[in-house]
């Protein structure tokens, strides 16, 4: 604003106080058995539904913790977004439940995206949207209870933007990570046995919490 003049520009600073987040990070193999199945499960919140038998473990977790809530389910690609939404809708059909999942990404028509946005703005509606970066910011979709993130987002800024869609109106921001990986082969070499998605998710959170690191904006 002071460009071309000798006037000083003052940037206002606001004390936002302490922020509270609620983060959860679960790791699933795409096929059974799961790690730690023989141990007592730690449950932070009771399930609100039951996924059909044979459901993908990671998607079953999302299905069982979105019923009766308004949530965003973030994916990292349009193809994955389509596949996730289709699977969740199939679980509704198998359980003979009303459809409670919508989809939102850049390849859909504007009218289709707007229809999903209008549904989310309705305070009486308890649907969830499977989305890509199109719903990271900028579009008002009302009050959300939580966001799910399938695998780790590509950047710290992406993580913060997606987390920031929740936690409004005095509630803590809430994100549940769902890391999904294939079982390593019995003779797999060490790098193939490492849960890279899980490590990437932990690293993204630590980079911001411990270093306050955020990628510089692209010019």
PLM features: residue spans?
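Conserved nucleotide-binding/hydrolysis micro-motifs of P-loop NTPases
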Residues: 5, 16-20, 28-31, 78-81, ...
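Conserved helicase motor "Helicase C" RecA-like lobe of SF1/SF2 P-loop NTPases
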Residues: 77-100
């Amino acid at each position: 604003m002071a460009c071309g003049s000798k006037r000083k520009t003052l940037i206002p600073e606001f004390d936002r106080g302490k922020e509270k987040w609620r983060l959860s990070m679960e790791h699933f193999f795409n096929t059974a058995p799961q790690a730690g199945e023989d141990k007592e499960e730690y449950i932070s919140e009771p399930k609100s539904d039951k996924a059909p038998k044979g459901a993908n473990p990671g998607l079953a977790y999302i299905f069982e913790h979105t019923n009766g809530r308004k949530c965003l389910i973030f994916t990292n690609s349009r193809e994955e977004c389509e596949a996730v939404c289709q699977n969740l809708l199939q679980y509704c059909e198998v359980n003979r439940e009303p459809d409670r999942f919508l989809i939102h990404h850049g390849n859909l028509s504007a009218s289709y995206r707007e229809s999903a946005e209008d549904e989310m703005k309705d305070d009486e509606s308890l649907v969830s949207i499977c989305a890509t970066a199109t719903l990271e910011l900028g579009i008002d979709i009302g009050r959300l209870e939580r966001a799910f993130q399938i695998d780790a987002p590509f950047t710290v800024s992406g993580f913060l933007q997606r987390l920031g869609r929740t936690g409004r109106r005095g509630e803590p921001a809430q994100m549940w990570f769902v890391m999904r990986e294939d079982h390593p082969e019995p003779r797999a070499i060490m790098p193939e046995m490492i849960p890279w998605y899980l490590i990437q998710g932990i690293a993204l959170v630590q980079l911001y919490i411990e270093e306050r690191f955020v990628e510089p904006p692209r010019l």
